[in-house]
Amino acid sequence: MRMLLTGKNGQVGFELQRALAPLGALRAVDHAECDLTDEQALRRLIREWRPSVIVNPAAYTAVDRAESEPEAAFAANGRAPEVIGEEAARLGALVVHYCTDYVFDGRKPEPYAETDAPSPLSVYGESKAAGTRALCLQAKKHLVFRTSWVFGAYGSNFAKTILRLAGEREELKVVADQVGAPTSAALLADVTAQILGQYQRWPNRDQFPYGLYNLAAAGETTWCEYARTVVAAAWRAGYNLRLRPEDVRPIAAAEYPLPAARPANSRLATDPLRRTFGLRLPPWREGLEHVLRQLHRTS
């Protein structure tokens, strides 16, 4: 396979470089090499490289800042995937794209399915929903992985923020009325590579099960319990912290207002992905323990 990877310096893109390398020729670019909001540069890159697979984890991910920068969010998250879809269709290429739980309002009591209609609460969620919709309309061959609460050893994320604060503070208040599944960037990359490996071996690619799939680690938690788990796992991994798990106090989201509203329910049903591709999705705590050990070794 001849692959093009965007956003190589993001937390998911970083892991994808590792996971995709064994599958074939890989060209990985960052924002400096190709600004996704520069439509002509993006088209030129795709036409020059002529990939058979385009993997696009690049996105505008500043959820709160998007409320005051909607044009920037929609350029990167809305229009860029549409352009990628148009160019992929010209080449007959497969596009792999990533979406978010923030396309939902969180009012559904059960985990969200792939068939549930988006109803975002934020500009970020609106931009991601628009980009996914446009991409799927343009590119027949697409795999969109909708995920939640992404973390990793590389880049900025909730787990690393809690780890830093645990070394600085003796008490922390964290939202306890929003539920989801923390999902490691490594899991996203590994599952992507496994499915692309199946795609590579698929006898008739016209019959490959393209589409949108929920992809998140097994289990669920609140942000507060997630933070407590980060602190407890960090102590076990050998970190010297000021904060103990019991020092993480629960609060309601209403007590910690942010510019962008978040869904109360971010749970995603993953049965179709696991059944279609024969995959096991490990518990979120496994990925967290691995990342914390990795960070401790390199600190």
Briefly describe each language-model feature range.
Residues 1-20:
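N-terminal Rossmann NAD(P)H-binding glycine-rich loop of SDR-like oxidoreductase domains
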Residues 21-44:
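Adenosine-cofactor binding site in Rossmann-like domains, unifying the SAM/SAH pocket
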Residues 39-78:
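NAD(P)H-binding glycine-rich loop region in Rossmannoid oxidoreductase-like domains
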Residues 68, 75, 79-83, 90, ...:
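Catalytic helix-loop patch of NAD(P)-dependent Rossmann-fold dehydrogenases
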Residues 136-194:
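NAD(P)-dependent short-chain dehydrogenase/reductase
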Residues 191, 198-257:
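Mid/C-terminal beta-alpha module of Rossmann-like enzyme folds, strongest
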Residues 249-269, 283:
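Active-site loop of classical SDR/Rossmann-like NAD(P)-dependent oxidoreductases
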Residues 282-299:
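Amphipathic terminal alpha-helices
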